Amino acid sequence: MDKPRVRFAPSPTGYLHIGGARTALFNWLWARRNGGTFVLRIEDTDRERSTQAAVDAIFDGLRWLGLDWDEGPDVGGPHGPYFQTQRLEIYKTHAEKLIREGKAYACYCTKDVLDAQRKQAEAEKRQFRYPGTCRELPYDPSRPHVIRFRVPQTGSKTFVDLVKGPIETPYEVLQDEVILRGDGVPLYNFGAVVDDVTMAINLVARGDDHVNNTARQILMYEALGYPAPRFAHLPMILGADKTRLSKRHGATSVTAYRDMGYLPEAVVNYLVRLGWSHGDQELFTRDELVRFFDFKDVGATAGVFNQDKMAWVNHEWLKKLSDEELARRALPYFQAAGLPAADDAKLRHVCAVARERARTFGEYVQQFRYFYAPVQLDPKAKDKFLTQDTRPILEAIRAGIAALEALETAALEKLFHDEAAKRGLGLGKVAQPVRVALTGGTASPGMYDVLQILGKDEALRRLDDALRIIG
C-alpha cells in the first residue's frame, strides 16, 4: 500500500475550531504513524470572509498543538500552490476537460430564473433540483455561464467508509451541481476533488457533515479519470445539550484554550479521545498516539465535549511536570496578567503548591495572584477573621515570625502549635486569621508554604496591614 498522503483543508474565515483541530490531529497521526505526508491546504475561495488574520490563527493553532505539516503555504512542496485562490487556472483546465468529454456543461440560466424555480419548488413543498435546462445546449463561452457537472440519472454510488462502513447514495437525490462559477472560482466539491487529485491525496479524513458530498465527489474523480481516495468520516463533536458544538457551549477555539492556560499535550490528548479509544487508557504521550492511532478504532457516534473532563486531563498532565518545567511554562501567564513573576525559586514554589489545587495556568494566576500582588481582602473573611478577638493571635504570630532567622517548616510549625496550645485553641483557629491577613481569603495552600513563598519581610508587612485594619 502506498504511504498515506493526507490533508487538512480549513477555510480561513475564523479561528481554528476544536472540531477542525481534531480533524487535523487524526490526519497528522495517520501520516506520522505510517511514514506519510501531511498537507496543509487553505480553502480561501470565500473572498469576502477569508482573512490573513484567520490564516495566521490556523498556523498558530496547529503549531501550538505540535501538528507540523510537510507541505503547505509557508513550507512549499511539489504540489503547490496551497491556497485555492492561487489555483484558479488548474480548476479551469480540469473543468474544460470535463466539458470536452461531455461530463460537464455550461449553464446559462440566470439567477432570476433559478430563484423562481426554487420558489415554485418551495410552494409545492418539494426539494429543488436543477431541472437540466441547459444539459444538451452547445457550449458558447461568449455567453455568461457557470459550469455544471453531469450526474448520471439512474443508479447509485456506494463507497466503504473507514469509520462508517458501506454507504450508498442513489443518483436521484443528486443534481447537476455547479462546479465552476462565472468568475472562475470553484464550488467546494469540485475544488476539493481537483486539489486532492493534483496533490496526490489518497485518504480523506474529515467531519461526517461531509458524508453527503462524498458520492458527488467520487463521481467527479471518476469523470476526471482518477481513482477516488479512501474516506474516513469522523463523528461530530457535540455540546452538553447534544447539539453541534458552538460558541454558546463556551470556548470552541484552540487559541482560547491556549490563552486559558491549557497544555497543548492535554488538548491533543483530550481531542483524540473524542471519538477514538485504545482500551481503557486515558492519558497518552505523543509517541503513544502515533504508535496506537488507527481509523479502525474511531467510533461512529458523536463525541460530547466536556470542559470539566478536559480540565481534568489538563490537570493530570500538569501533575506530570517537574516544578522547574511547571514554572517555566506558567511564567508567561503570570506576566500576561501584569504580575512581577520571574523564573525563580519563588515561582517554582508557587507552582509546587498549585500543582494539586489548580487545573490550568489560568487558574494558577487566578488563585495565587496574591503571591505577587497586594492582598485583596474578601469582605466576609475580613469581617469574620480580622477582629479584636483575633488581634492577639496576629500580634503573637507576627512577633514569632520576626524573631525567626529563617522561615523553616519546623520552626513555623512549632510557632503555630505553641500559640494554639497556649490559647487552648485548635490549630485552625490560629491559622485562619493569619491566612486571611496574608492571602485575603479563607482558602490557600498550607500556611507554612504561604509564609515561605511570601518571605519574611512581605509576611510581616501584610500582618502589619491586617493589624492596622483591625485598628
Curated annotation (Swiss-Prot):
Keywords: Aminoacyl-tRNA synthetase, ATP-binding, Cytoplasm, Ligase, Metal-binding, Nucleotide-binding, Protein biosynthesis, Zinc. SUPFAM superfamilies: An anticodon-binding domain of class I aminoacyl-tRNA synthetases, Nucleotidylyl transferase. It comes from Anaeromyxobacter sp. (strain Fw109-5). The keyword Oxidoreductase does not apply. InterPro entries: aa-tRNA-synth_I_cd-bd (IPR045462), aa-tRNA-synth_I_codon-bd_sub2 (IPR020751), aa-tRNA-synth_I_CS (IPR001412), aa_tRNA-synth_I_cd-bd_sf (IPR008925), Glu-tRNA-ligase_bac/mito (IPR004527), Glu-tRNA-synth_I_codon-bd_sub1 (IPR020752), Glu/Gln-tRNA-synth (IPR000924), Glu/Gln-tRNA-synth_Ib_cat-dom (IPR020058). Pfam families: Anticodon_2 (PF19269), tRNA-synt_1c (PF00749). A motif ('KMSKS' region) lies at residues 244-248. Monomer. Belongs to the class-I aminoacyl-tRNA synthetase family. Glutamate--tRNA ligase type 1 subfamily. It is found in: Cytoplasm. It is an enzyme of class 6 (ligase). GO terms for cellular component: cytosol. ATP binds at residue 247. Its cofactor is Zn(2+). Binds 1 zinc ion per subunit. Catalyzes the attachment of glutamate to tRNA(Glu) in a two-step reaction: glutamate is first activated by ATP to form Glu-AMP and then transferred to the acceptor end of tRNA(Glu). The lineage of its organism: Bacteria, Pseudomonadati, Myxococcota, Myxococcia, Myxococcales. Zn(2+) binds at residues 107, 109, 134, 136. This is Glutamate--tRNA ligase. It comes from the Bacteria. It catalyses: tRNA(Glu) + L-glutamate + ATP = L-glutamyl-tRNA(Glu) + AMP + diphosphate.
